Every structure is written in structure tokens, then in C-alpha cells.
Amino acid sequence: MDQDDAAEERFRSLHAASYTDLLRFVKRRIPDDDADDVVSATYLIAWQRFRELPDDVRPWLFGIARNLLANQARKRLRRSAVDVRMVATAEADRSPGIDARVDLVRAWWAVSAADREVLALVAFDELTDVQAAAVLGCRPATFRMRLNRARKRLRAAMGPTLPTAVESWSRT
């Protein structure tokens, strides 16, 4: 096996290990129809910069995808760089907890796009503080401060019905 074959095999392994998480990350931010294009462009950049990839490639890939999403947003003249899509589905029978979920969705959209992104990186994408900081291009201490402030603002927007799950978001 020559160097090119080894590099191709390593890239295939990287793709297999990260594709689902990366696609999920992108789909939470843009319509599903556009997500595959962003993910493909992310892997194209990863292939072009393959020799420069960091050891912990997952946050690096998320950062590349985030930059591509921001570029798309600027092209479309959107106000925010990235919107996290969150769809509330209320059941007709008003099952237990539905009111709290609806309140959470309202509170989610009441906080800024920057706060939603910080919260989503730890709650939905399950990144550590260090990984999320790498995605945003800031120091881990700065990210932790942003996360703490975002959680406080979400808590304030939610009021007394804040679900306990939100309280546990990234206590790492």
C-alpha cells in the first residue's frame, strides 16, 4: 500500500467516524436540502488540507462547516450567522411535559442566535468546552463564560418552568 492509498484509507475512516455527527450539526442550522452540500464542501476542504488536520478532527470539521454556513448566511444577507433549527411538536392530547417543552422552545427563540449556538454546541452536538471553543475560535475559558451567560439568559427567559435537563447542559 503506497502513501496515497494509506491517506485515502485514513480519510475514509475519518469520514465514516464523523459523517453522522457533522450532518446532524449542519441540519440543525439549515434546511435539510442544503445540508448535504455543506457537508460535502466541508469534506472537500478536509481532503485538501488533509496533511494539516489536527488530532481531534471533530471540532475542526464543525468549525469548517460553521464557516461555510456563515458564508452562506452572508450571501443571503441574513441577520445572524447561524440559526439553530428547533421544531416544537405539540401533541393533541397535551401529554405530560408538553407545556415545559413549549415554554423551552419559546425561551430558546427568545435568546440571541449567539446564545443558541453556544448552548447547541454542548446540548445537541455534545462537544466538550474545549471542542466547542475550537469550533467558535475562542479560548475554552471564553467559551465557558459565554456558555454560563447563555444558560443564565435561557433560564431567565424560561422562568420557573425550566426543565432540569437544561440545568445539566455542559457542567464539564
Question: Model segments located where?
Answer:
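Helix-turn-helix DNA-binding module
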Residues: 3, 109, 113, 125-142, ...
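Arg/Lys-rich amphipathic alpha helix in sigma70-family domain 2
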Residues: 52, 62-84, 96-100, 149
